[in-house]
């Protein structure tokens, strides 16, 4: 009798790459050099997450045949690459704004909690052979983490150029999560 629970070679390749990307993102965020600026700290901790999203999308595009999921991944990858460029361009201005010590502590505490929850949820997605389902379930907590961190940063004074980037991230990532959940629901796949 055949074991129907075995992971396919395609799923194994996808998952191995996924976990490498997740581990690299966690290391990149952890290694970010923090300063006395919430704006700076948000940017240097967000860039590894945006780069990871691009790699997650490319990983899916290597194996997916689902046109709708592929188009979503292509859009997300393009937007995330643009976000990295915009954040890197804003970094010099962000460095000019020094944040009060209390604000720094409060922001960083919340950002760390959000990141830990995101990593846990991304790592806890049940493994399976439907890589499109895996991708959507893995990317939803990534989007939620980005949205929550952007909302948190907006509670404090940030550089003038960063504020519109944060509002855009909240809007875009909220829409993307809605689209991903709708894709899962339309196909009869559960979101968790």
Predicted regions and their residues:
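All-alpha RGS (Regulator of G-protein Signaling) helical domain and cognate RGS-like helical scaffolds
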Residues: 1-192
């Amino acid at each position: 009798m055949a074991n129907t629970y075995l992971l396919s070679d395609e799923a194994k390749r996808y998952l191995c790459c996924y976990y490498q990307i997740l581990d690299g993102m966690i290391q990149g965020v952890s290694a970010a050099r923090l300063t006395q600026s919430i704006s700076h700290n948000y940017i240097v901790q967000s860039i590894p997450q945006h780069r990871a999203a691009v790699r997650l999308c490319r990983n899916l595009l290597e194996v997916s045949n689902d046109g709708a999921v592929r188009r979503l991944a292509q859009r997300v990858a393009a937007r995330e690459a643009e976000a990295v460029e915009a954040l890197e361009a804003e970094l010099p201005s962000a460095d000019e704004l020094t944040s009060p010590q209390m604000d720094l502590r409060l922001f960083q505490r919340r950002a760390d909690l959000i990141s830990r929850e995101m990593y846990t949820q991304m790592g806890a997605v049940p493994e399976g052979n439907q890589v499109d389902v895996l991708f959507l379930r893995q990317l939803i907590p990534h989007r939620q983490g980005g949205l929550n961190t952007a909302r948190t940063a907006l509670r404090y004074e940030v550089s003038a150029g960063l504020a519109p980037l944060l509002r855009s991230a909240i809007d875009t990532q909220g829409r993307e999560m809605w689209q991903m959940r709708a894709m899962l629901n339309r196909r009869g796949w559960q979101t968790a």
